[in-house]
């Protein structure tokens, strides 16, 4: 009866379908891991190292660093604020997508994290940050998006955006790695400057 309820005529047919699906899921996970590893390896190239140094210098020179994002990117923003605060930098996460931005943004650097870079609420906030005079750094999965085009500095990590109709399943490992690289570089640059 179970086999019939699952939509199959026989147990061997069910078993075959299960094994086929299991193989497809396994293949997807391997490809996804390969893509993530390839993405992380790019961060050691001269292009990325120079970009990271430039952005780390901007972050180290800021009076305040604000990290902003929505959904899964909000969690990365919260981690980033905690990481930079732990290194002695005045930083905060502002992850409410409807929070009004009203401040004097001079000497404030805003780091916006978004996979797509085209989320309406984040674009609205980015416009407000820019209007307030903040320096805008964006970290997204590509450079062909609205946030990337409106930012002062942009870091793309070029990974496929995996979504279904309900949510994103795109890995956040590259964004997390970028935050850790920037945090370490900023700390070392400021430490070296003080000596």
Predicted regions and their residues:
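Glycine-rich phosphate-binding loops that contact phosphosugars or nucleotide phosphates
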Residues: 60-191
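HTH-adjacent hinge/linker in prokaryotic transcriptional regulators
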Residues: 1-54
């Amino acid at each position: 009866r179970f086999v019939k309820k699952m939509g199959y005529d026989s147990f061997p047919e069910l078993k075959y379908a299960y094994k086929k699906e299991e193989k497809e899921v396994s293949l997807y996970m391997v490809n996804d891991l390969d893509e993530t590893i390839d993405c992380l390896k790019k961060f050691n190239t001269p292009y990325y190292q120079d970009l990271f140094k430039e952005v780390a210098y901007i972050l180290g020179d800021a009076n305040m660093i604000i990290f902003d994002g929505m959904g899964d990117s909000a969690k990365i923003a919260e981690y980033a604020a905690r990481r930079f605060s732990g290194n002695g930098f005045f930083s905060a996460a502002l992850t409410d997508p409807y929070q009004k931005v009203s401040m004097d943004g001079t000497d404030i650097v805003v780091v916006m994290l978004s996979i797509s870079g085209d989320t309406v609420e984040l674009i609205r906030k980015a416009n407000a940050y820019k209007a307030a005079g903040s320096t805008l750094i964006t970290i997204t999965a590509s450079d062909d998006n609205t946030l990337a085009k409106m930012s002062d500095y942009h870091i793309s990590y070029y990974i496929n955006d995996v979504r279904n109709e309900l949510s994103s399943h795109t890995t956040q490992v590259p964004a997390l790695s970028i935050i850790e690289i920037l945090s370490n570089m900023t700390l070392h640059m400021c430490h070296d400057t003080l000596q």
